[in-house]
């Protein structure tokens, strides 16, 4: 069974659904560890910095995005580790997962249609193609 699970989140509804699956899988074994990774996208974080009043306000806004996700773990009494990184989410998640030898990566999917995915690409698709372990994509 999976002992070392990486849950990639962005604070969206899709991340909340993937959180439920991470908790369910984590409960299947007593040795399971779930680590949440939240990657601050450079292009979005520049905008956040410009529109926030202070560093404290910016940090508060980022933590607010993760509040529901962390709340799910706390409600279930399931311990977790939270890691925040800066960069392009796809490659950052892949590097972190591969460098830290996770058994499973769980990521939510926005449900892009085939044209959107071809033009834009998706983080879940990038992760699934490049990470060295199994990937669970939650719709």
Q: Can you say where each PLM-predicted feature lies in the sequence?
A:
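General small-molecule cofactor/ligand-binding pocket signal
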Residues: 35-37, 81-85, 136
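Class I S-adenosyl-L-methionine
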Residues: 23, 63, 67-74
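Small/aliphatic-rich secondary-structure junction motif
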Residues: 3-49
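Gly/Ser-rich helix-loop-strand patches that form or flank binding pockets
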Residues: 4, 96-139
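A short acidic, glycine-rich active-site loop
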Residues: 53-64
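Structural beta-alpha unit
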Residues: 74-105
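Phosphate- and divalent-cation-binding pockets in alpha/beta enzyme and binding domains
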Residues: 17, 92, 114
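Short loop/turn motifs at secondary-structure junctions
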Residues: 1, 30-33, 78-79, 101
């Amino acid at each position: 069974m999976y002992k070392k699970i990486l849950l990639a989140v962005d604070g969206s509804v899709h991340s909340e659904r993937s959180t439920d699956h991470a908790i369910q899988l984590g409960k299947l074994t007593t040795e399971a560890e779930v680590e949440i990774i939240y990657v601050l996208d450079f292009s979005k974080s520049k905008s956040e910095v410009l529109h926030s009043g202070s560093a404290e306000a910016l940090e508060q806004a980022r933590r607010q995005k993760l509040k529901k996700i962390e709340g799910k773990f706390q409600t279930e009494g399931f311990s977790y580790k939270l890691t925040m990184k800066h960069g392009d989410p796809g490659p950052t998640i892949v590097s972190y997962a591969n460098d830290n030898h996770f058994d499973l990566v769980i990521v939510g999917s926005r449900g892009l249609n085939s044209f959107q995915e071809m033009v834009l690409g998706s983080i879940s698709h990038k992760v699934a193609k490049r990470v060295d372990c199994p990937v669970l994509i939650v719709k």
